[in-house]
Swiss-Prot record:
Organism expressing this protein natively: Pseudomonas putida (strain ATCC 47054 / DSM 6125 / CFBP 8728 / NCIMB 11950 / KT2440)
Entry annotated with the keyword Ion transport: no
Gene Ontology annotations for the cellular component aspect, listed alphabetically: cytoplasm
Annotated InterPro entries: Aldolase_TIM (IPR013785), Elp3/MiaA/NifB-like_rSAM (IPR006638), LIAS_N (IPR031691), Lipoyl_synth (IPR003698), rSAM (IPR007197)
Main location as per UniProt: cytoplasm
The keyword Iron-sulfur belongs to this UniProt entry's keyword annotation: yes
Enzyme class of the recorded protein, top EC level: transferase
Cofactor(s) the record lists: [4Fe-4S] cluster
Protein name: Lipoyl synthase
Region annotated Disordered, chain positions: 1-24
Residues binding [4Fe-4S] cluster 1, per UniProt: C84, C89, C95, S324
CDD domains: Radical_SAM
SMART domains: Elp3
Annotated pathway: Protein modification; protein lipoylation via endogenous pathway; protein N(6)-(lipoyl)lysine from octanoyl-[acyl-carrier-protein]: step 2/2
Length: 338
């Protein structure tokens, strides 16, 4: 049996006797990042000496433009968060310069501690009941035609935040009736049925939930989450709302093998997932999970070919692909084929 340490180097099981910093007491509204964030997860991450040098094909210039500044100012004005900023997405400049953004609702503090993710952890504050309306106004101001809404995990809420998603969708459609909406939802751990019942009443145009990695690496990369649960979430939504495309994605470079990626893709199709994104994992800091490999663009292209053979309606596969990158184009192609 493969141990977590064998699966991902630079990890030590928590029972290791090596002293580790005492976890900080988490107060409501305080955001923990880096070493403080991962202090209580089931594995200990040994900080890398330095971040790995990126190959030429993955380097990105972050453009500075008035449009980027305008969108950031608009987000601040309406007290909104974008996952583009919170997760340090490499495509932030391109998306913001194009006048688009992926909005992150329910605050910027997550109740999970996934050590690949750069979003802060802590005890979130109560939901902002004005957020759905503020979000709708911002989207109308930006005159967007396609919007992705995602969120932090909110394990403190009875429905995991599903009603808040539905409220946002309703307000946005009231002000921008022509907009298409994609939701990138958490796993609704322990509350799937109630969350999906709410979601089905106000469904998005695309329903997205990321598996993130292969099942062997879940304990290291997604503590508190379950691979089969996430697959079931996507399939059960599809059964409730069969006309809405479902979507999921993986990060590559955490220690998975190509064979494991192909196996996960097959499982996705068995669970009626229509759309797939595959991108390169980039280590946000020395305290996050280390990059085990940089996947070559040719390998990403091969995964895309295999995905279409399996029956995915759209496959976005490349080093800089992220779940919401060119999401409008992905959805357009997928719906044409549905």
């Amino acid at each position: 049996m493969t141990t977590v340490q064998e699966a991902v180097p630079n990890l030590i099981p928590t029972q290791d006797a090596t002293p580790r910093p005492a976890p900080k007491k988490v107060e409501a509204g305080v955001k923990l990042r880096g070493a403080d964030k991962v202090a209580r997860i089931p594995v200990k991450i040994i900080p890398t000496d330095e971040l790995p040098k990126k190959p030429d094909w993955i380097r990105v210039r972050i453009p500075v433009s008035p449009e980027v500044d305008r969108i950031k100012q608009l987000l601040r004005k309406h007290k909104l968060h974008s996952v583009c900023e919170e997760a340090s997405c490499p495509n932030l400049g391109e998306c913001f310069s194009g006048g688009t953004a992926t909005f992150m609702i329910m605050g910027d503090i997550c109740t999970r501690r996934c050590p690949f993710c750069d979003v802060g952890h802590g005890r979130p504050k109560p939901l902002d009941l004005d957020e759905p309306k503020n979000l709708a106004v911002a989207i109308a101001d930006l005159r967007l035609k396609y919007v992705v809404i995602t969120s932090v995990d909110r394990d403190d809420l009875r429905d995991g935040g599903a009603q808040h998603f539905a409220d946002c969708i309703r307000e946005i459609r009231a002000l921008s009736p022509g907009v298409q909406l994609e939701t990138l939802v958490p796993d609704y751990r322990g509350r799937m049925d109630v969350a999906l019942e709410i979601t089905a009443q106000e469904p998005p145009d695309v329903f997205n939930h990321n598996l993130e990695t292969v099942p062997r690496l879940y304990k290291a990369a997604r503590p508190g989450s379950d691979y089969d649960w996430s697959l079931d979430l996507l399939q059960k939504f599809k059964q409730l709302v069969p006309h809405v495309p479902t979507k999921s994605g993986l990060m590559l470079g955490l220690g998975e093998t190509d064979e494991e990626v192909i196996e996960v893709m097959h499982r996705m199709r068995e669970h009626d997932i229509d759309m797939l994104t595959l991108g390169q994992y980039l280590q946000p800091s020395r305290s996050h999970l280390p990059v085990q490999r940089f996947v070559h663009p040719d390998t990403f292209a091969w995964f895309a070919e295999e995905g279409y053979k399996m029956g995915f309606k759209n496959v976005a596969s490349g080093p800089l692909v992220r779940s919401s990158y060119h999401a409008d184009q992905q959805a357009h192609e997928a719906k044409i084929k549905l």
